[in-house]
A protein has these predicted regions:
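Internal alpha-helical scaffold of NAD(P)-dependent oxidoreductase catalytic cores
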Residues: 3, 15-113
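Short acidic low-complexity segments
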Residues: 220-233
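Short, well-ordered coil/turn residues at beta-beta hairpins
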Residues: 29, 239-241, 256
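Alpha-helix C-terminal capping/helix-to-coil transition sites in glycosyltransferase folds
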Residues: 7-8, 22, 232-233
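Interdomain hinge/lid region at the active-site interface
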Residues: 63-67, 75-167, 171
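ADP-ribose/adenylate-binding Rossmann-like module
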Residues: 251-262
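NAD(P)-binding Rossmann-fold cofactor-contacting core
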Residues: 174, 181-219
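Short, small-residue-biased leader/transition segments that mark boundaries at the very start
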Residues: 1-13
């Protein structure tokens, strides 16, 4: 007769880095069963041995609690992204210097100068999925802040699209990269794709520069292979994350990337 034990670990979103330098190890397991408890500790020890760090904080909650740790951690990050994006929206519309204000706010050590660079919204593999999942899990439980993160992310894309349309003034909108962040090839639920949807609904003419794409079109939109041609065609160049490749056309670029980092 065979028996099996099931354990699970929090998903890493930066696998190559987090496997070597984890901030914590969380191993979820069923609520009871000595074999499963032993298996959980064995699995954690394998992760500890494979890491470059030592004395890694390790938790052994039940499976539901382990999943909740992941969902609440990612939703907190989504809330923080949305907070600094709303700060930036306020400053942009009030004519204030966003960077001055963020720098001043983040000098408070309780807040810190991390995860504070404005963007077009959060996206990627985890944050959109996990925030929606957590809202669904709350059900009838009050959750103003959790739900607001999802709403704020949509409203940020609305604002960005309006600003782009105003700057383009009827000209061609060039989208520089589809990726969710710098040094990534991941398009999944990237914020720029949500902005593109809004631009298309408004009737804007949109072209894309994305060097990882080999096709001539993406989702029905032209993909321009030559960066020089892309710059020539676009009345405004939209970049969720600014790169040095655009430094020669600053007058065309619309970005909210103040620190050139994620």
């Amino acid at each position: 007769e065979m028996s099996a034990s099931l354990v699970g670990s929090e998903m890493c979103i930066r696998d190559r880095y987090d496997n070597l330098h984890p901030s914590r190890i969380v191993v979820g397991r069923p609520r009871s069963g000595t074999a499963t408890e032993a298996d959980a500790h064995l699995f954690a020890s394998l992760l500890q041995q494979g890491a470059a760090e030592r004395d890694i904080p390790t938790l052994y909650p039940n499976a539901t609690e382990a999943e909740a740790i992941k969902l609440f951690a990612n939703t907190y990050l989504a809330v923080r992204v949305s907070y600094f994006n709303e700060l930036d929206t306020y400053c942009e519309l009030k004519g204030l210097d966003t960077r001055q204000i963020i720098d001043g706010v983040c000098l408070d050590p309780r807040i810190g100068a991390h995860y504070n660079n404005p963007s077009f919204g959060y996206g990627g593999y985890c944050l959109p999925k996990d925030t929606r999942q957590l809202v669904a899990n709350f059900g009838d439980i009050p959750n103003r802040i959790i739900s607001a993160a999802v709403t704020a992310n949509d409203e940020r894309k609305d604002h960005i699209a309006r600003q782009i349309l105003r700057k383009a003034a009827g000209g061609v909108v060039g989208v520089y990269r589809l990726t969710m962040k710098a040094d990534s090839d991941n398009f999944r639920e990237s914020s720029i794709r949500g902005v593109i949807e809004r631009l298309r609904r408004a009737g804007a003419s949109v072209v894309i520069y994305e060097p990882t794409l080999k096709a001539a079109a993406f989702d029905g939109l032209p993909v321009v292979a030559s960066l020089a041609e892309f710059k020539r065609m676009a009345a405004v160049i939209v970049a969720n994350r600014a790169e040095s490749a655009l430094d020669d056309v600053p007058e065309k670029v619309y970005t909210r990337d103040l620190y050139r980092r994620d």
